[in-house]
Amino acid sequence: MQYPEPISKLIDSFMKLPGIGPKTAVRLAFFVLSMKEDVVLDFAKALVNAKRNLTYCSVCGHITDQDPCYICEDTRRDKSVICVVQDPKDVIAMEKMKEYNGLYHVLHGAISPMDGIGPEDIKIPELLKRLQDDQVTEVILATNPNIEGEATAMYISRLLKPSGIKLSRIAHGLPVGGDLEYADEVTLSKALEGRREM
């Protein structure tokens, strides 16, 4: 079906979002058209505001509106422990359980040779630099329990073994093939408690 150009552009824009196919994009576009103009303008402003005012922390890579982020700036945090995660959403998931008090390092991805993503394409060099500069005694590998997450954890483990830094991996209370962001606080808490040395 041929839509007027403004609707077609809106549909195309929605289809650029992950998990949004043609049918869902059409539904979203027509829903937006049915909304009051002030609500649509607020939505558009929120999108632009987020894009303009959010950045990644220069220390840990978490999403933030200040640099360094509130976690890296918090003097009450245990600076001797770094929890390595794949995405900023994983930091938010870990923080929800309110049990971990160390710092984070966000890799912004995982090693995936099938997708052409190697160790140099994610924030592993930045992690190694942090470990030289900081007084870190433990690294918790909290990458997702899927093939890419496991490969990334094993790669980092091999790199860090000679350093003498204590290495642990969160326990697999998380389902294999799952993502941290979808886990509830109890599951994450048990996974963190049951981490093992590597």
UniProtKB/Swiss-Prot annotation:
PROSITE patterns of this UniProt entry? RECR, TOPRIM
Q: Which InterPro entries match?
A: DNA_Rcmb_RecR, Rcmb_RecR, Rcmb_RecR_Znf, TOPRIM_dom, TOPRIM_RecR
Checking Pfam families in the record gives: RecR_C, RecR_HhH, RecR_ZnF, Toprim_4
Q: Where are the zinc fingers (C4-type)?
A: 57-72
Could you tell me which SUPFAM superfamilies the record lists for this protein? Recombination protein RecR
User: Which CDD domains does the annotation name?
Assistant: TOPRIM_recR (cd01025)
Top-rank taxon of the source lineage equals Bacteria
Provide any one GO MF term from the record.
Answer: zinc ion binding
Q: Does the keyword Cell inner membrane apply?
A: no
Domain Toprim: start-end pairs: 80-175
Is Amino-acid biosynthesis one of the keywords?
no
- Please give the biological process terms from Gene Ontology that the record holds: DNA recombination; DNA repair
Identify the keywords attached in UniProt to this record, alphabetized. Answer: DNA damage, DNA recombination, DNA repair, Metal-binding, Zinc, Zinc-finger
Q: What does this protein do?
A: May play a role in DNA repair. It seems to be involved in an RecBC-independent recombinational process of DNA repair. It may act with RecF and RecO.
What family, per the record? Belongs to the RecR family.
Against HAMAP family, the record matches this protein to: RecR
> What PANTHER family would the database entry show?
RECOMBINATION PROTEIN RECR
Q: What is this protein called?
A: Recombination protein RecR
